Amino acid sequence: MSAAKRDAQSLFPLFLKLSGRACLVVGAGAIAEPKIEGLLVSGAKVRVVAPRASSIVERWARAKRIVWRRRVYREKDLRGALLVIAATSSKKLHARIFRQARRCGILCNAVDDPPHCDFYYPAVVRRGAFQIAISTGGLSPALAQQLRKRLEREFGPEYGAWVAQLGRARDRLRKKNLNAESRRETLHRMAAGAVAKISRHRIHAPR
């Protein structure tokens, strides 16, 4: 088994809370745009370093949604960042950012450059709190995107509403004088009912 395949199969999946956390993006062009946008959606405090930026990134900077440092990357830009995204066309720069981030204990993702990644961006279906993340461990991002498009057709906005409804029910149960076992059984019964409802919806939904 190749090192790339071995790494892809040993990835640890998780969802990070980035709200209010500092994240660095090196690059401000078309490659960087979706990465910056994803961080903004997650509530991160985004710093961008690049001599030039796309019109969209410039607009985010003018609106103060991001901090744009209009110059080349320097190692000191890593200070205080939880993670860094290297989103340029230079593999040489990506390698340098990766090495420096490693020394600082900062996670790094270099776009389309798996050897210089501590983590990968999954393809995500978002329906409120209901999210499905698809990863191929960097081996085939195109496949992950195709699967995302298929799942987006199958899982509509109603799934987010159902999850929100279950969340409210869970909060109500927590306030009741139930022992842990009874509460767990009730929650699982409600979840099973939601799954059955989802299954019926999928059967009768137009294709």
Regions found by a protein language model. Give the residues of each.
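Hydrophobic, well-ordered beta-alpha structural blocks that scaffold small-molecule cofactor pockets
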Residues: 1-60
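Residue-level detector of alpha-helix initiation sites
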Residues: 30-31, 92, 138
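Hydrophobic beta-strand scaffold residues
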Residues: 46, 68, 107-108
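Short loop/edge segments at beta-strand edges and connector loops
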Residues: 50, 68-72, 112
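Glycine-rich, highly charged phosphate/nucleotide-binding loops
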Residues: 59-79
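ADP-ribose/adenylate-binding Rossmann-like module
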Residues: 83-89, 94-121
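E1/E1-like adenylate-forming module used to activate ubiquitin-like modifiers
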Residues: 110-160
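An accessory alpha-helical subdomain
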Residues: 138-207
